[in-house]
Each structure stands twice: as structure tokens, then as C-alpha cells.
Amino acid sequence: VCGDVCVWKPSEKTPLCGVACQNLWADVAKENDLPEGISCLVTGNYEVGEYLTTDERVPLISATGSTRMGRIVGSTVAKRFGKSLLELGGNNAIIVTPNADLKITVIGSLFGAVGTCGQRCTTTRRLIIHESIYEDVKNKLSSAYEQLKIGNPLDESNHVGPLIDIDAVNAYLNAIKRSKKEGGKIVVEGGVIEGKGYESGCYVKPVIIEAEN
């Protein structure tokens, strides 16, 4: 990657984030007398991604997203003997050992799980906790979850903003339903938030589900 021009496409759901990042890069490039065009932003839907993936002038494709997307990108790039880097279907865990600093554990787990409303590819989805400290960690984390303020992300007093769209809300609800069906125990109740300020239907409560290994 180093030394090459970068052409990148953000998610079609967050084009303005892409524009903001590109503007930051442009400022850095200008301050360091770098030529324009080293980093090029293109926005659009999946068809733009398909165009980049099939273009033989692009020797390396790096893609972050679902495993379904990765299969398509990987096989398409391989057909033209290109190279691909795929980061797919994150299911990240934090392992908590008996000698862990529980204060740092709770802060790190909370931010890892609910930061950006759990929508980063590096979001924490699981905690694997040693039985000797399990109840203590569970109680501390549950207490922290119950103190979260959920609302407009432009209000700095809030900790958690909305999910990106209704599809994400449905995926969240289906995950809770599936967990219950498989024997999961709800520790901190989730659900869609209603009322003034939550009219979009995309604000949800972060949920903790207990599962025996």
C-alpha cells in the first residue's frame, strides 16, 4: 500500500463521513507539499465498489464488511489475479483474567461495545470472563450500562447515538430474539426507544446477554 495512490469508497450509508475524512487528508497533504490525487474519494452504492473490484488497473483491493461481501470481492479479484485484503464479520472478544484491573476492564468493555453504537468493525461483541470474577464483572458492567445516556450524538452529554437505519435495528432485534431462543439470559434489557427525540426509530438500548459456554 505504501507509495501507491489510494482510491477509496466509504459505505453508501455514510458518505459525509468519507468526505470529512478526505478533507482532513487534503489539509495534511497541503501542509506537507504533497500533490493532489494521492488519495481519491469516490462515493456511491455497491455498483461503484464492483467497478473498482473488476478494474485491472487496481492491483490491490482492501475491503471491510460482511462475509457475504468478502466472498464476492475475494473471488472477483482472484479471477483477474489481483490481490485482496479482507476484514470481515467482526466478532471481537475481550478475555478477562482473574488478575485483571476491573476498573479498566469495565471502561474498555463499555467503550468497545457501545462506542459508535456498536457499529465499528472493531466493536466488542463478547466478554469471556474467568469464573472467579464473573459476578463482579457482570455487576459492574451492568451498572455502567444502566447509566448510559442515549440520544442525539451532537449533544456531548450523550454516550450513545442511533443505529444507522431500520435494517440495523431489525438485525439488533433479531439478534436478541435468536439469543433468547438459544438459551441466553438477559442481564440488561434492550429494546427500541420511543418518544420525543427518538422519532427515527433507530435509537436502541445496549443489551447484555449472558450465555454459558
Which positions does each model-derived feature cover?
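Short acidic capping loops at alpha-helix termini that bridge into adjacent secondary structure
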Residues: 35-39
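ALDH superfamily catalytic-core signature
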Residues: 27, 54, 60, 68-213
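Positions that flank functional sites
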Residues: 14-15, 44, 92, 194
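Conserved small-residue-rich beta-alpha loop and adjacent elements
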Residues: 1-32, 81, 103
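Short beta->alpha connector loops at strand-helix junctions that form conserved
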Residues: 4, 9-11, 43, 64, ...
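Short Asp/Glu-rich motifs
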Residues: 17-19, 48, 96, 198-199
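A structured beta-alpha segment of the ubiquitous adenosine-cofactor-binding alpha/beta core
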Residues: 40-62
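Short alpha-helical
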Residues: 13-16, 46-48, 67-68, 79
